[in-house]
Regions:
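Bacterial N-terminal signal peptides that target proteins for export
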Residues: 3-20
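Bacterial N-terminal signal peptides
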Residues: 18-29
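SH3-family beta-barrel domains
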Residues: 34-59, 73-77, 84-87, 94-99, ...
Length: 193
């Protein structure tokens, strides 16, 4: 082998090594975010995760594409939904009634919300304990912005009121998947597990 071809092989080898290193870094960078079945997510974000609806007119579809039939329409901007699977442009979500559907990526916001799906008011406290003063009452079937959850309590806000409510008292705060990602869109709602 001539020195000229040896140099070409070494140069090619270095380029391939560089490409392998770049690909390995890209794979490792997204290695922490996976779908429930273990596949990496297209966004690199965790699944399940919480998002909220940007608009008061969001179409829920049977599958990830405009060719799939519309199952229903959400009419509540800020409604929290849990992403349980995703493609690059579509999110498979679990809603407060444990319905599963696909929505377009562009109608989901990374801002979190909380939904009181019960028929009772939920007390919003001044601090993270039940003995602290009640600042407001979170009405049934309503949505508030959610800032953070910590030590079993979540800080919420609506207009000029801020306070804390128990983490398990509303939809949008749970760490575990609320619907089974394997369930087909439009099937009767039921919790995961």
């Amino acid at each position: 082998v001539s020195s000229k071809s040896r140099g070409h092989v070494q140069s090619l080898s270095r380029r391939i090594g560089g490409v392998v290193a770049v690909v390995a870094c890209a794979v490792l960078a997204g290695a922490g975010a996976t779908m429930p079945d273990g596949r990496p997510t297209p966004t690199g974000l965790d699944v399940p995760r919480w998002v909220s609806l940007k608009s008061s007119h969001v179409r829920a579809r049977q599958g990830p594409g405009l060719d799939y039939r519309i199952l229903w329409e959400y009419r509540a901007a800020g409604l929290p939904v849990q992403v349980i699977a995703e493609t690059r442009e579509w999110r498979k979500i679990c809603d407060p009634e444990h319905g599963v559907a696909w929505i377009k990526r562009s109608v989901a916001s990374g801002r979190r919300g909380a939904f009181n799906g019960s028929d009772a008011e939920v007390a919003v406290h001044a601090a993270r304990n039940a003995q602290s003063p009640v600042r407001a009452r979170f009405s049934p079937r309503s949505v508030v912005a959610l800032d953070e959850c910590k030590d079993g309590w979540c800080r919420v806000r609506a207009q000029k009121i801020k306070g804390w409510l128990p983490e398990g008292s509303v939809f949008g705060t749970q760490a575990m998947a609320q619907c089974d990602a394997r369930r087909g869109a439009g099937e009767a709602g039921r919790r995961a597990g």
